[in-house]
């Protein structure tokens, strides 16, 4: 079964006047936590073959942590993965991506709430609340998605 990692970005800077939401970076604490979480994912054997992320800075930085931990893989930014992204569009895209995926393929998506929670529900009909630096692990088998694990930073950090 192919695997999909749906990852929420790490801890971002607070909202502040004059800074666009899309420009908010990870905090120093967010960097440390996110590095540890991504190392933990890879340590569990969840090493992506390809990755997709929101173009928002905090998502780009979170994906950079995973990219480094995994030793590199092809990356692509998508405006469909922003907080206002449409889960319906993402579902169609993911179904196409996984239609002929080899059973050992692992793809990672780094995005935001509420988009990720809505996407998990759309794919699996299960509710999950992805906090910062959380990862929903989904398996794709015979056209169906299954939520097999919800990993929190405490589950993945040393």
Model feature map: region roles:
Residues 43, 68, 96-103, 140:
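Secondary-structure boundary motif
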Residues 2-81, 85-88, 129-130:
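Active-site-proximal alpha-helix that buttresses catalytic centers in soluble enzyme cores
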Residues 35-42, 91-99, 120:
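Generic structural signal for well-ordered alpha-helical scaffold segments
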Residues 10-11, 57, 81, 113-115, ...:
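Short, flexible active-site-adjacent loop segments at beta-strand->alpha-helix junctions, enriched
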Residues 124-157:
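Domain-level recognition of soluble alpha/beta enzyme cores
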Residues 80, 85-107:
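Internal catalytic or translocation cores that form aromatic/hydrophobic pockets or channels
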Residues 97-133:
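Non-DNA-binding regulatory cores of transcription-related proteins
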């Amino acid at each position: 079964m192919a695997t999909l990692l749906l990852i929420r970005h790490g801890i971002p800077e607070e909202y502040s006047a004059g800074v666009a939401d899309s420009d908010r970076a990870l905090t120093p604490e967010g960097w440390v936590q996110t590095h540890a979480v991504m190392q933990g994912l890879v340590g569990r054997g969840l090493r992506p073959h390809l990755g997709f992320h929101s173009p928002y800075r905090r998502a780009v930085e979170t994906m950079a942590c995973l990219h480094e931990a995994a030793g590199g893989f092809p990356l692509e930014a998508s405006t469909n993965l922003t907080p206002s992204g449409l889960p319906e569009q993402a579902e169609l895209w993911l179904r196409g991506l996984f239609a002929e995926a080899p059973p050992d393929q692992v793809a990672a998506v780094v995005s935001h709430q509420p988009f990720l929670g809505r996407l998990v529900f759309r794919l699996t009909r299960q509710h999950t609340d992805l906090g910062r630096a959380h990862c929903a692990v989904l398996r794709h088998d015979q056209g169906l998605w299954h939520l097999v694990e919800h990993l929190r930073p405490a589950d993945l950090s040393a």
